């Protein structure tokens, strides 16, 4: 029997700001069976895309992507916030509602031609996905898919990537 992950995501009104509904995945993470099941679904997706490495943006992308890579027996590459990596990095900036941010990866993190699936907790406006994809491609990798626990469809992030295969465990339409 398939799991309805939406039943296990907490919706918190007016967080972090009034008018926002925060979709909280921690109930899934706190239940080992649910966490394993969510990981397995994303791993099956990544496997179907031929992933050779998983990339996860800081911070919840680590929580989502690391166990996927472990299940598949492939590597995990973190896309970090600035000044967190000790060696030479590639950087990409992206816009947020309230400003901009930067992600970085080690320049040797992705091999040319390597097939990559990006894993993260949530896709909203897709700013983080844009920056992560740009980093991977600048390093010579091929983004073959992106996988999320949650997709907020009203924010139309998916529409920005007509040629990218995107998988989500749960989709929210409106509030």
Swiss-Prot record:
Belongs to the purine/pyrimidine phosphoribosyltransferase family. GO terms for biological process: adenine salvage; AMP salvage; purine ribonucleoside salvage. This is Adenine phosphoribosyltransferase. SUPFAM superfamilies: PRTase-like. GO terms for cellular component: cytoplasm. The lineage of its organism: Bacteria, Bacillati, Bacillota, Bacilli, Lactobacillales. The keyword Metal-binding does not apply. GO terms for molecular function: adenine binding; adenine phosphoribosyltransferase activity; AMP binding. It comes from Lactobacillus gasseri (strain ATCC 33323 / DSM 20243 / BCRC 14619 / CIP 102991 / JCM 1131 / KCTC 3163 / NCIMB 11718 / NCTC 13722 / AM63). Gene3D superfamilies: 3.40.50.2020. CDD domains: PRTases_typeI. It comes from the Bacteria. Its EC number is 2.4.2.7. HAMAP family: Aden_phosphoribosyltr (MF_00004). It is an enzyme of class 2 (transferase). Homodimer. It catalyses: AMP + diphosphate = 5-phospho-alpha-D-ribose 1-diphosphate + adenine. The keyword Glycosyltransferase applies.
């Amino acid at each position: 029997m398939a799991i309805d992950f939406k039943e296990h995501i907490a919706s918190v009104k007016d967080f972090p700001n009034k008018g926002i509904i925060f979709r909280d995945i921690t109930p899934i993470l706190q239940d080992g069976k649910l966490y394993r099941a969510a990981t397995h679904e994303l791993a099956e997706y990544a496997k179907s895309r031929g992933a050779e490495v998983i990339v996860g943006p800081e911070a919840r992308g680590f929580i989502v992507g690391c166990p996927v890579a472990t299940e598949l027996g492939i590597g995990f590459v973190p896309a970090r916030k600035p000044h967190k990596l000790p060696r030479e990095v590639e950087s990409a900036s992206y816009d947020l509602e309230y400003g901009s941010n930067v992600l970085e990866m080690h320049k040797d993190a992705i091999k040319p031609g390597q097939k990559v699936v990006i894993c993260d907790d949530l896709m909203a406006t897709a700013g983080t996905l844009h920056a992560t994809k740009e980093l991977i491609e600048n390093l010579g990798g091929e983004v073959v898919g992106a996988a999320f626990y949650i997709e907020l469809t009203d924010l139309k992030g998916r529409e920005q990537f007509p040629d990218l295969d995107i998988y989500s465990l749960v989709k929210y339409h409106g509030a």
